[in-house]
């Protein structure tokens, strides 16, 4: 578990540097703890792995002021666990269910139990995202998503994909995108 935690912190450090995360940004996290453990998604959830992932994200949140949004599994329509203050600040309509490992997933369930005032929302437009185990978080990212490449491409046995977003470039041939 120690190696997993070190790898995770390394991934988060590189992600933070490249994605330019700061206060006011929302980061969506999709995590299959089963995939991290080398099993098929949705079959072998692990609270121990969820705890390690959550703690690393808490540290990142405390350092940067970002808001975290944990994606539930398909059984809860990929709803997101966020702090109530995040839902209010971003005017996100709250829905209700209590994520549990078999309906929501171990990661979302762990987050729900350990956040100060957790609520569920159906949609979000996050500024950045972390997908551990191919959970498909793209539906919750703002357009335009830009891949973030880090040196570690796996957490345990799970494939890790990271993204940041940028504003759409508008205009035509006369548009200017860089300040002189």
From Swiss-Prot:
Source domain of life: Bacteria
Matching InterPro entries: Antibiotic_NAT-like, DUF436
Family stated for the protein in its record: Belongs to the UPF0340 family.
Stated name of the protein: UPF0340 protein BLi03936/BL03990
Annotated organism of origin: Bacillus licheniformis (strain ATCC 14580 / DSM 13 / JCM 2505 / CCUG 7422 / NBRC 12200 / NCIMB 9375 / NCTC 10341 / NRRL NRS-1264 / Gibson 46)
């Amino acid at each position: 578990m120690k190696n997993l935690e070190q790898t995770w912190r390394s991934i988060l450090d590189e992600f933070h540097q490249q994605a330019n995360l700061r206060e006011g940004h929302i980061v969506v996290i999709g995590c299959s703890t089963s995939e991290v453990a080398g099993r098929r998604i949705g079959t072998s959830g692990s609270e121990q792995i969820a705890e390690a992932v959550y703690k690393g994200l808490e540290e990142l949140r405390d350092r940067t002021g970002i808001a975290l949004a944990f994606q539930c599994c398909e059984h809860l329509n990929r709803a997101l666990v966020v702090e109530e203050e995040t839902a209010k600040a971003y005017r996100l309509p709250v829905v209700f269910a209590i994520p549990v490992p078999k309906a929501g997933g171990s990661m979302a369930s762990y987050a729900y139990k350990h956040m100060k005032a957790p609520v569920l929302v159906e949609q979000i437009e996050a500024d950045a995202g972390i997908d551990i185990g191919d959970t498909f978080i793209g539906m919750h990212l703002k357009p335009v998503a830009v891949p973030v490449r880090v040196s570690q491409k796996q957490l345990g046995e799970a494939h890790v994909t990271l993204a940041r977003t940028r504003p759409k470039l508008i205009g035509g041939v006369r548009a200017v995108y860089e300040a002189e």
